[in-house]
């Protein structure tokens, strides 16, 4: 029987690692190749170092803009589809961060994730972040 919860658990792990700043753990839960689509330029990151490259670019942009303390909270999944060794998860999300010390909340974001089951573990193969409103 296919488990609908295992891919969602992997998505939550990835976000938990992001929230604690554990980039190596974020990368370890990803498939190779990995793809990221985000609102931050250059908007697309691909390959075995996609997560590390994306995180570095987020931190550089944050430093330039005075943004710190990023934290993502995921809601209940809107969509979970598991077919064999592939899964697709769509989750509403809220991101909080500080800009020059002022708290900002970005609500209504959508985190869409494609996963592959490799060696009995769900790995994130791609994700896209659709920005909400601040």
Show the residue positions of the predicted features.
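Short, cysteine-centered beta-strand-loop-beta hairpins and adjacent loop/turn segments enriched
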Residues: 96-105
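Beta-strand residues in well-ordered beta-sheet regions across diverse protein folds
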Residues: 37, 90-92, 125
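Short, low-complexity N-terminal intrinsically disordered segments enriched in polar/charged residues
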Residues: 1-33, 123
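Hydrophobic/aromatic beta-strand elements that line small-molecule binding cavities or substrate pockets
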Residues: 74-80, 93-95, 110-116, 129
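A solvent-exposed, acidic/Ser-Thr-rich amphipathic alpha-helical stretch
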Residues: 23-85
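Short beta-strand edge/turn micro-motifs at domain boundaries
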Residues: 88, 107-134
């Amino acid at each position: 029987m296919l488990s609908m919860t295992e891919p969602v658990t992997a998505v939550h792990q990835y976000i938990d690692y992001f929230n604690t700043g554990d980039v190596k753990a974020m990368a370890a839960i990803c498939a190779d190749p990995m793809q990221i689509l985000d609102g931050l330029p250059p908007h697309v990151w691909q390959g075995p170092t996609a997560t590390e490259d994306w995180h570095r670019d987020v931190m550089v942009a944050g430093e330039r803009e005075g943004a710190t303390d990023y934290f993502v909270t995921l809601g209940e999944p809107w969509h979970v589809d598991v077919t064999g060794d592939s899964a697709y998860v769509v989750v509403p999300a809220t991101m909080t961060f500080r800009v020059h010390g002022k708290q900002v909340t970005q609500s209504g974001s959508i985190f869409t994730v494609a996963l592959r089951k490799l060696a009995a573990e769900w790995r994130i193969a791609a994700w896209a972040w659709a920005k909400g409103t601040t």
